């Protein structure tokens, strides 16, 4: 990983450069960089609202990134050691649903922990996928889920070789010896 390259913030840098051009906003968002809503400026701060602009060519487009968003995604992938990364809006729910809906079709099986977020279940309802549940281990003393054990996931894969995906949710602290 190129540590110097990782110091870049392409989207933020593009927003700052755009701000310096002093373009007059005639589109969304309606607060017009805070000029139309002093209460919003007070709540979020001038810095935040001054950079809140609509997507336009100099700032790239999330639907088809070709410049600063693409560069930010490449930097994220490099930082995570992944082949690719995608920036999302709409929170984790939209990211989870995008992942599942892009892979699982009606009648397809997906292996997942029994305690998944409702966004996973909603995605399965939308696509018609069939959940194959793996019960997570529990810390009885603390009453918290520890995640799925590798052996149980391997068994679920062996029992369901036609499954098209395995959905894994992991907290950083529970990565060791867990899926």
Residue locations for each model-derived region?
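Substrate-binding/gating loop at the entrance of the active-site cleft, primarily
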Residues: 112-131
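Short, acidic/turn-prone active-site loops that include or flank metal/cofactor-
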Residues: 115-118, 135-141
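Active-site phosphate-binding strand-loop segment of PLP-dependent enzymes
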Residues: 142-178
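N-terminal "arm"/small-domain region of PLP-dependent enzymes with the aminotransferase-like
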Residues: 1-67
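Conserved beta-loop-alpha segment that forms the PLP phosphate-binding cup at the N-terminus of a helix
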Residues: 84-108, 123
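Gly/Ser/Thr-rich loops at beta-strand to alpha-helix junctions
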Residues: 69, 90-95, 116-118, 171-174
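Conserved N-terminal alpha-helix of the aminotransferase class I/II PLP-enzyme fold
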Residues: 46-94
């Amino acid at each position: 990983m190129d540590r110097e390259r990782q110091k870049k913030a392409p989207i933020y840098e593009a927003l700052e450069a755009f701000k310096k051009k002093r373009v007059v906003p005639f589109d969304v968002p309606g607060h017009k960089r805070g000029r139309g809503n002093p209460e919003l400026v007070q709540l979020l701060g001038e810095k935040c609202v001054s950079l809140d602009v609509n997507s336009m060519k100099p700032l790239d487009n999330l639907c088809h990134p070709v410049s600063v968003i693409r560069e930010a995604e490449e930097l994220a992938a490099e930082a995570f050691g992944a082949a690719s990364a995608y920036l999302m809006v709409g929170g984790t729910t939209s990211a989870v649903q995008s992942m599942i809906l892009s892979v699982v079709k009606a009648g397809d099986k997906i292996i997942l922990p029994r305690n998944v977020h409702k966004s996973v279940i909603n995605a399965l309802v939308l696509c018609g996928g069939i959940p194959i549940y793996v019960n997570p281990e529990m810390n009885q003393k603390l009453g918290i889920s520890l995640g799925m054990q590798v052996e149980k996931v391997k068994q679920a894969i062996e029992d369901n070789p036609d499954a098209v995906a395995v959905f894994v949710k992991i907290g950083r602290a529970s990565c060791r010896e867990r899926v």
